[in-house]
Amino acid sequence: MKVYRLDKFIVPHNSRQEFLAKVNEIHTVLRSQAGFVQDFLLEQPLNDEAFNLVTLIEWEDASYIDAARSAVMTLHKNSGFNPQDAMARLGIKADMGTYKSINS
């Protein structure tokens, strides 16, 4: 059964460039992982200070998620990147989770 990783971020406009660069770097790694089907990076204006960014990744099934997570953790470790510290520094709020289709 296909599964979906859906992450929603509230991103201050002044953090946009740095955050999108990191998101694109992560998605480049994810696109090369076994079980990857497709992804979407979506944005929505929120107000004068921030916008919503939603990332959606479709996986063949849940068995591929741990390997993909490990690949991203390796990327972070090799580059010295700490996601929690970066999100705090950039003022980004996140709501992240893995979902399955109701109609499957």
What are these regions (language model features)?
Residues 10-20:
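Short, surface-exposed ligand-recognition loops at beta-strand->loop->(often short) alpha-helix junctions
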Residues 30-37, 58-95, 102:
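An amphipathic, aromatic/His-enriched active-site/gating alpha helix that lines ligand/cofactor pockets
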